[in-house]
Amino acid sequence: MRDGMITEEQCGENFAYILEDKTDFLITEYKMMHGQEADFLLKCVKMLYNGKTELYYDTKSCLPLAIQSGAEDTEGMLSVLGNILHEVRRVTENGFLSLLKLDISADKIWVDPATRKIRFVYLPVAERLHKDVVEFEEHLRGCLLYTSDAADE
């Protein structure tokens, strides 16, 4: 994922990120991910995998945005997109979490199909996934355009 520092591994329907260097893990951000106010994040459990830190993400009852978008009509898709923007704002309001550590690929934004509630993948690591907010916004915009175009087909 990030120049060999983080490796992604599929675990059935779930997935995990394995950190090559355990000092990259940030415990404060990990604890904030489990706060009452962080219900916009996919559930994450820290474990050990062959002596390395593994961040295991539970995707139970959620579908990736890339798949869910195909099942939505126009009104439903607008609702999902609105929920994404709402949850992005909640991340910025949190104060302890950073937008720059959200994995916002279309296959890493998760949607509860029953409620259209959004769950993001957050990596509590030292390195950012995006260099700044402008890059984050461009990546998010591109992901949303790609997803909405795919839903139209």
Where are the regions that the model predicts?
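Gram-positive cell-envelope targeting signals
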Residues: 1-5
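Protein kinase catalytic-loop region centered on the HRD/HxD motif
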Residues: 89-98
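Conserved structural core of kinase catalytic domains
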Residues: 16-24, 29-78
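Conserved small/polar residues in nucleotide/adenosyl-binding loops
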Residues: 146-153
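Catalytic activation segment of kinase domains across protein kinase-like and atypical kinase folds
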Residues: 100-144
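Generic beta-strand structural signal
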Residues: 10, 48, 111-113
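Conserved alphaE helix
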Residues: 76-87
